[in-house]
């Protein structure tokens, strides 16, 4: 029995999503593709992540953010769904912060991974 799920995320920026997926070591394809949902249905996705069992997962744009589309019964990633979403959110937030600090004239000086899994960023801006 299929457990097709469409999970809303807070992800709105495609380029930051691609950076986050790459950082997680996932190989993704960018184009409109269809993934199998259940026995005879398909669902359109904008980013496709292939799985060995051919029950691929993906991300689809819906109004103002991306949704994760997957059959949870056929989930074949190195992390549980919850851990995957946590890691993806952290990577996405990291790249969002880096991009915003660059826009404001800051430069990343140091990055420290904390014991609790969080990341401490030290940025600097020179005033001229």
From Swiss-Prot:
Its main location: plastid. Keywords: Chloroplast, Plastid. It comes from the Eukaryota. InterPro entries: Uncharacterised_Ycf35 (IPR009666). The keyword Magnesium does not apply. GO terms for cellular component: chloroplast. Pfam families: DUF1257. It is found in: Plastid, Chloroplast. Signal peptide: none annotated. Belongs to the ycf35 family. This is Uncharacterized protein ycf35. The gene is ycf35.
